[in-house]
């Protein structure tokens, strides 16, 4: 007879006891070495769908265990495979309970922790991890939630329309899906950070799904911090709203650090555009991704990323939308990601961005690079500043206010060549004032009086503009000389160009001379 031992992933010493303070509770496995057959079902019901009340101190159906423990020991249990005859030794928990069994409250650190245990087995009906979905029966507040290696079964935390408040951090460190939230009537609040350590994989089967298939709102007081290459889905299904009243708010930064992690905004299809606000995006890995869920059922998702930066941030990954379904490669997806800049600082998106949705700048500074061959939807400038990195391309554009920046990067300054903006359709000037062209204080000494014209914007057609470009554009933050603008015919439309000189062009010079004359006359009267 063969004997095989399955060792725990995080090695506690054999028969070690892990005891917790009165303010720390473990969710208890309901089906340890037990009543499930090889299908993983009890009375025909999958063991992760046996609803267990999160706030109950009582024993759950099919279990001799209470829901919450203050600690556990680990012991060996042998089980024999009926077909092969092989005996396997599993490491399983033996839980410890307080004299008065309790349930979590606002002072409790909640642990879904299975990293000391062995994996289950289909062949002999042994399963243990997070059997039975956690179910809320009322609005609930806890101090923190820690999810650690709940890998054998998905963790299904069903909120059933009740609100869940976590005063401090949420930590996800697991291989399998962990889902929190199950109703659009639920509001989830996290006072601290969401730390995502995850599995090291990017499959939808390895994702942390905060919001489940869509809750009413998600508010995170801190940031989302990726500490490994992993995947997270942030999902709301709230009522119709606008960018400055988003269904999801992450007050801090979504920090990808150096990891090729993935953040999905939205899961499962919904007709209502959902707004996901962040205090900024940060990350140095060009393979990091912000997108939507990519399952067949998500087709048609419209998710809008709102950037509410209060400090400058740079994200080198890409913002994209999936084009084919992960669960059926023949299904073409029409999901859309939009971007709104509504902050007080600068957000740089320097990756291969190819999202198909619109871009709106309300306030703050947005610097955007478009992937080669890609184009976004409509660019709308209502305020703040927009600038390209290399090139930014759009289906159309409308200017109501704000400035357009050039010489936005060290590369452009080193080459002394401004970035370009491509508008494949109409460029509409709806605002009445001049469009400020912000040159970011670049030293144009070598460009002055060199007789060269530099392309800035190319548009298929123009609307609301004067015949003379200098009537519609004005240079700001130019360290030396003067800028002159002109429209010329391009390959597919009109091209806005700029040239730099040591003296203003005649019309501007005449206007300046006239102002000086008026000033002199006014002084003479006094």
Set out the residue ranges of the language-model regions.
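A short, hydrophobic C-terminal helix/tail in secreted or cell-surface proteins
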Residues: 505-522
């Amino acid at each position: 007879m063969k004997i095989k031992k399955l060792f725990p992933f995080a090695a506690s010493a054999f028969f070690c006891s892990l005891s917790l303070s009165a303010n720390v509770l473990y969710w208890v496995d309901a089906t340890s070495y037990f009543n499930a057959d090889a299908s993983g079902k009890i009375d025909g019901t999958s063991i992760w769908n046996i609803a267990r009340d999160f706030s109950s101190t009582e024993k759950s159906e099919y279990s001799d265990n209470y829901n919450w423990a203050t600690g556990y020991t680990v012991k060996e249990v042998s089980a024999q495979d009926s077909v092969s005859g092989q005996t396997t030794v599993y490491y399983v928990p033996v839980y410890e309970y307080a004299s008065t069994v309790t349930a979590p409250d606002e002072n409790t650190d909640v642990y879904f922790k299975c990293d000391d245990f062995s994996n289950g087995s289909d062949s002999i009906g042994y399963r243990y991890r997070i059997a039975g979905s956690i179910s809320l029966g009322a609005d609930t507040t806890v101090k923190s939630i820690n999810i650690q290696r709940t890998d054998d079964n998905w963790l299904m935390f069903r909120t059933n329309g009740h609100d869940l408040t976590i005063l401090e951090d949420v930590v996800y460190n697991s291989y399998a899906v962990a889902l929190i939230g199950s109703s659009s009537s639920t509001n989830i609040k996290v006072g601290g950070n969401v730390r995502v350590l995850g599995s090291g994989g990017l499959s939808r089967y390895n994702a942390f799904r905060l919001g489940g298939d869509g809750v009413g709102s998600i508010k995170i007081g801190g940031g989302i911090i990726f500490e490994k290459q992993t995947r997270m889905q942030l999902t709301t299904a709230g009522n119709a709203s606008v960018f400055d009243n988003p269904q999801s708010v992450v007050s801090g930064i979504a920090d990808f650090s150096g990891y090729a992690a993935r953040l999905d905004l939205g899961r499962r299809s919904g007709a209502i555009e959902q707004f996901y606000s962040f205090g900024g995006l940060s990350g140095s890995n060009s393979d990091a991704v912000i997108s939507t869920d990519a399952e067949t059922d998500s087709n048609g998702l419209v998710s809008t990323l709102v950037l509410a930066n209060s400090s400058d941030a740079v994200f080198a990954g890409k913002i994209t939308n999936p084009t084919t379904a992960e669960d059926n490669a023949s299904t073409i997806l029409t999901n859309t990601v939009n971007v709104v800049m509504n902050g007080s600082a600068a957000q740089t998106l320097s990756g291969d961005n190819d999202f198909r949705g619109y871009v709106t700048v309300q306030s703050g500074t947005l610097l955007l690079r478009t992937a080669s061959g890609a184009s976004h939807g409509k660019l709308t400038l209502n305020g703040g500043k927009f600038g390209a990195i290399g090139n930014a391309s759009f289906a159309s554009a409308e200017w109501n206010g704000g400035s357009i920046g050039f010489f936005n990067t060290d590369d452009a300054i080193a080459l002394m060549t401004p970035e370009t903006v491509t508008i494949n359709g109409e460029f509409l000037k709806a605002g009445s004032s001049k469009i400020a062209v912000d040159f970011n204080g670049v030293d144009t000494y070598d460009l002055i009086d060199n007789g060269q014209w530099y392309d800035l914007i190319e548009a298929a057609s123009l609307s609301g503009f004067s015949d003379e470009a200098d009537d519609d554009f004005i240079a700001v933050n130019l360290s030396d000389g003067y800028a002159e603008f002109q429209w010329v015919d391009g390959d597919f439309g009109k091209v806005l160009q700029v040239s730099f000189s040591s003296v203003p062009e005649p019309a501007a010079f005449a206007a300046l001379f006239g102002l000086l004359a008026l000033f002199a006359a006014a002084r003479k009267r006094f």
